[in-house]
Amino acid sequence: MRVNSNKKIHKMKRDPYKTLLRTAGILAIVVVVGVGVFYLCSLAVTSDYVSTRNRIENENAEAELEFNAMMNELRAEQSTALTPNTGVVSSADLPSWEKTLNDTLWRIEDESNAGLENTSTITLDRASLINGGLLLVNPWHSLPSDFSEEGLVSIGTASNFQIQVQDNSVRVFQPAYDALSEALTAAKDEAGLEYYIVMEGYRSVAQQEELFNAEMEKLSSRYSGNALIEETKKNVNYPGNSDYHTGMSFRMDVYQRDNAALNNLKFQAESEQGAWLTEHCWRFGIIFRFPTADFPKGWEDKSYKTGVSAQLNLYRYVGKAHSAAMRVLNLCLEEYIEFLIDHPHICVYEDGALKYEIVRIKIADDAQSVQLPVPNPASSYQASLDNMGGVVMAYTY
């Protein structure tokens, strides 16, 4: 305000521009201070997050070491026994098997005298167990009557035809497709190998019957009666007794358009693709289904167990735990299930660390659902009927 010569007081008008600048300045200071505070808080939160994450990772690593140490102690305790008559504790030679695969030492130990520790219980129905991956179907074990095709996927459609197929009718169950896709991706990434083609997958009993009857017709001029049936079985499995029925098997070959040199190669004996897949498929839960004498090259004849003497480029999904164990033990599927009957609890170690634990549990033939144990430390499990009166549980750690 100001006082004039008449001593009257007059209020001075404020400059609105200066007021606006002053307000803007104050707001700018508030914003800068706010940003600074937010930045400092963000740094504190980030630092706390990193610290917490590192602490949790360290705790997890320590917990894993403690768990493996505990398992080693349990193995040590279970490998001792009282000597008869003396009562002295002595070391017992529990069976174990070792093999080096891809520069990694794999060891299998028999834990059949020990139970699972710290378990919870799950309930699974028979339908899911049938498609668990380990179902044995061969000349002596028929496809279960309650088997369902539900869940089969077209390999061509599922892969957007990135995986070559004979036609769009080539189907398998999802676990088999996932394993095949992973294996073929690795073949390309690791070895630069492409041009695989899936020639055949799931076969229905009706399709198998057509093939069987066609083979009988070809042989009918030379055989008759039971002799005709038995001779036909040597080339084509009896309907209901083919591994193709499981939806977990697929027959492979190589193919590239306008590349006759590649297309004429014998998949197993001559192509790099066949050699790589046979050597590495176990890493992805896949086995070579029907080894015969020197087919694949250097492999032992298993036809006396499988009942199949034909040279088939057939691969079968069984799951990573089982394919690793079968590779270490050098067993075909028939031998492996017999092995699990004799050794119903085994542990599989990768470079000394527990990787898989496998347990076979007897069940009633007419059981429609089964309560099964799952160790709480396990990160995942696979459950499957074996078609020989048992459920096989495989736990991954």
Locate each region found by the language model.
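Extracytoplasmic cell-surface/polysaccharide-interacting catalytic and binding patches
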Residues: 2, 9, 13-26, 30-201, ...
